[in-house]
């Protein structure tokens, strides 16, 4: 469910960055800032509408995927807290996409890593230390994503003031809105369509009982922390290709794709060396040690899923590059 909604938000924001990158590559900075201004308008509307609809239909969505009665209340609370963080998710992806559009892929990555580490630390404190359960997991996500947005805002104001619109560049522009939506919405739908398969998997898994639901939920949280790197490599490629397309340097696009694939494979080796021996220990961050069966199934899922990370990484890179 979260991947369906967040995937649309992330993909859309990545698409919004493409016209910005193309204008930057063509050295048309006024046009670039006009795209920035109008992309912020769209993002605000998306954040309000998606958050509102997600919260309104949260219960119906959980019934649709056969959520067991034993965990329904906890799942509802967790999802509502996740949905409350949608504006932060959109804000981070929009701002980090704008930073990448100017050729800086490192800083958004550092901010993402910082937010992920903070998320893990807060999970440990709120879930294990304070015993807040799913409420703690939701609060941790909310706070960590909020911090990532603040970091992006701080960086743009300090280091990338060229992105800040001024004067006429702040005007509402129907043509630019249309171009932004034509790039953003299809990329968002790509992720949403992929997520339909995950929802079917979640629905089938829910029918197996609470042990499997708990195992799947815990493993997906850790899995996302690892696989979000693939998404960020792909997003970086979207802006990289946009820049070089705008500058008419088409030969650099192929070089970038090959380099990103090599980077993805190196990262896969790192995840394999970390996940295969330590999956059980990682699951214990989210599952009580006494729930041995849940830990076992969650760790098994993590190890099996890890074998297919190269396929996911390759798909993400090529999809964003195209």
Description of each model-found segment:
Residues 1-52, 89-108, 215-279, 313-322:
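Small-residue-rich hydrophobic transmembrane alpha-helices
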Residues 118-119, 285:
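Alpha-helical transmembrane segments of compact multi-pass small-molecule transporters, enriched
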Residues 1, 62-69, 125-132, 192-221, ...:
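Helix-terminus/linker motif at the lipid-water interface of multi-pass membrane proteins
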Residues 96, 119-123, 127, 140:
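Small-residue (Gly/Pro/Ala) motifs that create kinks and tight helix-helix packing interfaces
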Residues 103-110, 134-138:
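Short, non-helical or kinked segments that cap or interrupt transmembrane helices
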Residues 81, 92, 115, 144-148, ...:
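Transmembrane helical elements of multi-pass membrane transporters/channels
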